[in-house]
Amino acid sequence: MIPIYDGHNDTLLNLPRTNRSFFEHGAEGHIDLPRARAGGLAGGFFAVFVPDPGTEPPPAPADGSGPAPELALIADRYRATATMPPPMTLDYAQRATLGFVASFYRLAAEANGTARVIRSAADIRRCLAEGVFAMHLHFEGAEAIDPEFDALEVYHQAGLRSLGIVWSRPNRFGHGVPFAFPSSPDVGPGLTDLGKELVRTCNRLRILIDLSHLNEAGFWDVAKLSSAPLVATHSNAHVLSPASRNLTDRQLDAIRESDGLVGLNFHVGFLRADGARDPETPISVMADHLDYLIARLGVDKVALGSDFDGATMPAALANAAGLPRLIDGLRGRGYDDATLRKLGTENWLRVLERTWGA
């Protein structure tokens, strides 16, 4: 089985909202340890995403085919800048973030050696060799980072290894892309002065900067300032699906020139040419995006960034246990095992080693 290190999941948010265990095979959500093992999912980026204050978690879908409805509703609230809620306070963001980080470490503690928090690419390699599920801490949006970056230093010591400057909402550092279709990602201004300093600080700490959710002006600011490879952990090709969340050819070319990486997002609304949230989207559409990304970037600069537990999956794949169906579809297109291993783990390891150090 081809092992897969995944560039994005929202499992820390989804687990309490679906009232399920990470260690038991479930019918809800997309990732638990049994389904991960069944599908060859060897680990990945565990995102801390802080919802807006006052949002109430609704019930999860009974068939487990999609995320809790709240996640779709969040996206609906962020379709236009004018209708977005006001930025959350630092105090709220930090309190919520601490809760998610604590949950992350509780998962590892409860795993009894079956899952492990990683802080380096070497840690991932050890987990792969030992059959241990690898988890690394990622922030999806920098709302919990103070203007002095003291919290960032603490979070880094606590294991933070990657960070998205924004989710699809503005904060003190920059501006995200509203969830619009069809739409260009070229909406709004670039990074603030504080956002530019955040880039420099992440470079100093060797924290990977995630460009997914960032608007195009902010993307180019990072490209100009950052000394690290450019990485979009969970985005697709705008030319195939003109969602604001996807990357233009010019952005893809910049990622290629930086020796960076794009992780394929499995969300059907970012895969389809019509942008519909239709679970009956065939796996072949995922393969179409991979074909295009590989042709544009090169086979060493493309990986997977599923958005499991935070998006609507193609029903034919459904959850982590369905990953072999994607692999089989790629084999049917002529992808050999060497290429599949690159897409599964090796390309992530390459860019993480370049960013974090060995």
Describe every region a protein language model picked out.
Residues 1-185, 242-304, 308-358:
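N-terminal hydrophobic targeting/anchoring segments and the immediately downstream early-domain regions
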